[in-house]
């Protein structure tokens, strides 16, 4: 989904990926982000819980844009954060409890997203009004089902 979204704006964009295999090692994430910055990236996006704080720190040090994950991370880099993907775990837990109470819980993969209120995107004031509008239009289309985000769980190098 992330790469598809980026390519919808710029088909020639190159998305680089790095894996830290950690959700807590901020130093490792900072080193991975620094290597990507040295390789020419101009935006850092992480999906690594506390580990991602290191990636944000690298973006701040290099004075490039970054994107938060899991919660509103704008306070970590007020001048650099473009947006934050927010996971509303209370919605996920409520759905799970509801299925147990309704006696229809199954051991399966449950895909909850924006339409369910489980995920949202907080757009920062570092974005121009035009970019905010474009992003919000895409968000609204995802929520309504007009735009479907392909789920691809393939690991990439």
Please provide the spans of the model-predicted regions.
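A residue-level marker of the well-folded mature domains of exported/periplasmic proteins
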Residues: 1-157
């Amino acid at each position: 989904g992330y790469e598809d979204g980026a390519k919808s704006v710029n088909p020639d964009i190159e998305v680089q990926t790095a894996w830290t295999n950690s959700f807590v090692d901020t130093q490792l994430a900072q080193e991975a982000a620094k290597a990507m910055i040295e390789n020419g990236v101009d935006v850092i996006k992480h999906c690594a819980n506390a580990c991602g704080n290191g990636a944000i720190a690298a973006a701040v040090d290099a004075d490039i844009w970054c994107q938060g994950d899991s919660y509103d991370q704008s306070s970590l880099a007020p001048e650099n954060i473009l947006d934050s993907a927010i996971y509303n775990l209370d919605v996920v837990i409520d759905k799970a409890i509801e299925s147990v109470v309704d006696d229809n819980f199954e051991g399966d993969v449950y895909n909850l997203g924006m339409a369910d209120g489980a995920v949202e995107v907080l757009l920062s004031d570092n974005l121009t009004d035009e970019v905010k509008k474009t992003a919000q239009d895409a968000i609204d289309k995802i929520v309504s089902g007009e735009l479907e985000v392909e789920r691809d769980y393939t690991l990439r190098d």
